[in-house]
């Protein structure tokens, strides 16, 4: 082989080897440059810088742990906070507070406000019901007192009526009695005959003016009234004395007709009874054959 060609080949191989070696050296230098360089000492040396770094790292770790603890807070603590007396106080939300914690505290506060509003409404309703109950009791007590007074008044009026009737009966009895000695059978018969005439006259007339009745039997008007009252009490005479000074005799059959009329109608007013009285009661004098 030609020596010149051989020399050229060897030269090329050498160049290639040198190029590869140069490239490897170039790659090693950047890696060495990327390694941390020694910190230049400033104002107190490396010890102070490292202390600052450690303090910051501890602060970040504490903040992370605090945030995790707040997010994992148990529901029991929430219920305890709801029962606390100062929960309704104004809460100052910190700008550094987490969004989840802020939302929980806001929800807790709203829940407490709603609970207080419901409690307030219940208290108002309870107070109103108590007032209504007291008012109802007052009304019932007033009605019971009025009923008691009414019953006492009715009882008193009934007692006075009975007492008055008894007094009238005694007066009537005394009017028909004969006083003194010398009482005999003929005088008793005359008295009974006079009483029968008195009753018969009223029954036949049906409606008699008390003054005319007294004049007919030569009695005082009050004496005639007393006799009628006594006969009514004994059941020998039935009727009513109206406000015009007349006595209206009502027979037993007419009383039964009135009772039957009232029973058929159920409830009858005085006006209706007065309107139908002409059909139920015969007011015309009875002709004695």
UniProtKB/Swiss-Prot annotation:
S-S bridge residues: none
Region annotation Disordered: where it falls in the sequence: 65-168
Domain of life according to the entry: Eukaryota
Lumenal topological segments: 1-2
Record-level Gene Ontology MF annotations: ubiquitin-like protein ligase binding
GO terms under cellular component: endoplasmic reticulum membrane
Location of the protein in the cell: Endoplasmic reticulum membrane
Transmembrane segments: 3-23
Positions in the Cytoplasmic compartment: 24-289
SMART domains in the record: DDRGK
Extent of Basic and acidic residues compositional bias: 87-166
Keywords, comma-separated and alphabetical: Endoplasmic reticulum, Membrane, Transmembrane, Transmembrane helix, Ubl conjugation pathway
Pfam families from the UniProt entry: DDRGK
InterPro entries, sorted: DDRGK_dom-contain, DDRGK_domain-containing, WH-like_DNA-bd_sf, WH_DNA-bd_sf
Topology within the bilayer: Single-pass membrane protein
Composition bias, Acidic residues: 70-85
Quaternary structure and interacting proteins, as annotated: Interacts with Atg9; the interaction is transient.
The family this protein is said to belong to: Belongs to the DDRGK1 family.
Functional summary from the UniProt entry: Substrate adapter for ufmylation, the covalent attachment of the ubiquitin-like modifier UFM1 to substrate proteins. Required for ufmylation of Atg9; protects the nervous system during aging, possibly by stabilizing Atg9 and supporting its function.
Protein name as catalogued: DDRGK domain-containing protein 1
């Amino acid at each position: 082989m030609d020596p010149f060609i051989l020399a050229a080949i060897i030269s090329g191989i050498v160049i290639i080897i040198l190029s590869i070696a140069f490239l490897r050296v170039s790659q090693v230098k950047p890696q060495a440059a990327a390694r941390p360089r020694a910190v230049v000492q400033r104002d107190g040396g490396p010890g102070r810088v490292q202390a600052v770094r450690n303090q910051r790292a501890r602060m970040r770790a504490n903040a992370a742990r605090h945030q995790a603890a707040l997010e994992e807070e148990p529901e029991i603590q929430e219920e305890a906070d709801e029962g606390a007396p100062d929960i309704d106080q104004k809460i100052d939300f910190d700008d550094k507070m987490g969004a989840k914690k802020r939302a929980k505290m806001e929800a807790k506060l709203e829940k407490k406000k709603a609970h207080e509003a419901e409690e307030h409404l219940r208290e108002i309703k309870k107070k109103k019901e108590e007032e209504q109950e007291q008012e109802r009791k007052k009304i019932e007590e007033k009605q019971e007192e009025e009923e008691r007074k009414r019953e006492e008044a009715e009882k008193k009026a009934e007692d006075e009526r009975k007492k008055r009737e008894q007094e009238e009966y005694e007066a009537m009895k005394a009017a028909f009695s004969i006083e003194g000695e010398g009482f005999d059978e003929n005088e008793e018969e005359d008295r009974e005959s006079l009483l029968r005439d008195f009753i018969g006259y009223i029954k036949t007339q049906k409606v008699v003016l008390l003054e005319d009745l007294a004049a007919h039997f030569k009695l005082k008007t009050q004496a005639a009234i007393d006799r009628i009252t006594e006969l009514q009490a004994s059941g020998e005479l039935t009727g009513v004395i109206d406000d015009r000074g007349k006595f209206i005799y009502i027979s037993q059959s007419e009383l039964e007709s009135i009772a039957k009329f009232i029973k058929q109608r159920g409830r009858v007013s005085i006006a209706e009874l007065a309107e139908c009285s002409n059909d139920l009661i015969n007011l015309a004098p009875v002709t004695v054959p």
